[in-house]
């Protein structure tokens, strides 16, 4: 998987071969499925993308898989991508990644009703920092309601954290083959970190989150 990751841009043929080898051996591995999905999508092989992503999503739902699935076919409209992701989400109705993927894609499609519908069941009992940030995006992009945006961003400070790639107390935006601390293989796991990853003040965090929302992105 690490080799496929390293040559994804420079040698896509080799990357596909390596990613598919890893995917075949372990259908629950996110990174090889995401790599293969992106590369097959770039070649217009939509059916292959769908099959690979669906196999892994059912075993290990993950945002990177949802993104690869959404962009499985070049030239699709935001509405097309939303419908595709909704179909994927239906296969894992009990995973929080399913409604989050739908809400994220709905926001990109400016379908505020669908975005709110996806997130509403999470607001009581399953609230997380990502959910709060998505709600802030909805309030900002749909209504330009700065007050509501800041309310939701303020709630991220005390909301439960979301899973991230983490190994030995280190958080990474992407999966890595080895721990930067111990060098151990396969150390990075997709899970909620035990300790805070930053010592920034609450005010600094709110400023950063507000900037991210204004850019239409989400924190990792």
Map each language-model feature to its residues.
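TPR/TPR-like (Sel1-like) alpha-helical repeat modules
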Residues: 43-64, 123-129, 139-164
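Residue register within tetratricopeptide repeats
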Residues: 13, 47, 79, 113, ...
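Residue at a conserved register position within TPR or TPR-like alpha-solenoid repeats
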Residues: 5-7, 36-40, 69-73, 106, ...
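Structural motif corresponding to the intra-repeat A-B loop/turn of tetratricopeptide repeats
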Residues: 9-10, 42-43, 59, 72-76, ...
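"A position-specific structural signal for the A-helix of alpha-solenoid helical repeats
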Residues: 1-2, 35, 68, 101, ...
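Intrinsically disordered, low-complexity, charge-biased linker/tail regions
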Residues: 1-24, 63-71, 79-101, 150-220
